[in-house]
């Protein structure tokens, strides 16, 4: 089971965590930026996740990453949490740690980022929005929004290649994960995992089973 740390802001709001109004929330104070500027909130999540790791196989995924420095800061906090748990005699297991690739910065730097983590999950919704400079919430721009844009597909291929070159497995989530027009393409690219909602499990699975690339 892969568990993502706090990922609110922009189109993801939570009643229990109020954020101030921002003119451009999609590029504002959200996701890992909240966790790194409010480390006690982050530590609370990490403590719970590592406690849970003693009872089952989990992995932790960090959203909205843009730099190696962020990952290294995350690792410092993770080590602090693990040290505190050891001192308290709390049992936990080592877990895989990965990141969301949902910004052009992360995609371009994916060869370097892959040296720091165990896996990538390509968040195609935000990656498309940021790459094409199109607000997904703006209906006036619907005709310009093209998730199949060659730039997006090239970026996905780059991330897959860079991840695999450093031993990271790579998955795809977001709307494109369930886009059956691209399932065959993703298999040819070498994708390791497609994350889809329950509604799309059967049609995507059928395509994978019948694909010549499924091996």
Functional labels for PLM-detected ranges:
Residues 1-215:
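Conserved alpha/beta-domain cores
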């Amino acid at each position: 089971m892969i568990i993502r740390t706090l990922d609110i802001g922009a189109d993801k709001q939570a009643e229990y965590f109020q954020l101030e109004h921002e003119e451009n929330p999609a590029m504002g104070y959200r996701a890992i930026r909240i966790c790194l500027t409010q480390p006690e909130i982050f530590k609370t999540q990490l403590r719970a996740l590592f406690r849970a790791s003693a009872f089952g196989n989990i992995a932790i995924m960090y959203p909205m990453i843009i730099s190696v420095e962020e990952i290294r800061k995350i690792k410092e906090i993770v080590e602090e949490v693990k040290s505190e748990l050891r001192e308290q005699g709390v049992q936990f297991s080592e877990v895989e740690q990965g990141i969301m690739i949902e910004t052009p910065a992360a995609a371009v730097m994916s060869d370097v980022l892959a040296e720091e983590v165990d896996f990538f999950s390509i968040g195609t919704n935000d990656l498309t929005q940021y790459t094409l400079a199109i607000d997904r919430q703006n209906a006036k721009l619907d005709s310009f929004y093209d998730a199949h844009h060659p730039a997006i597909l090239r970026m996905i291929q780059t991330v897959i290649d860079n991840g695999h070159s450093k031993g990271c497995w790579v998955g795809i989530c977001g709307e494109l994960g369930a886009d059956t027009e691209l399932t065959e393409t993703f298999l040819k690219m070498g994708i390791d995992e497609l994350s889809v909602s329950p509604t799309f499990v059967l049609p995507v699975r059928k395509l994978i089973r019948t694909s010549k690339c499924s091996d």
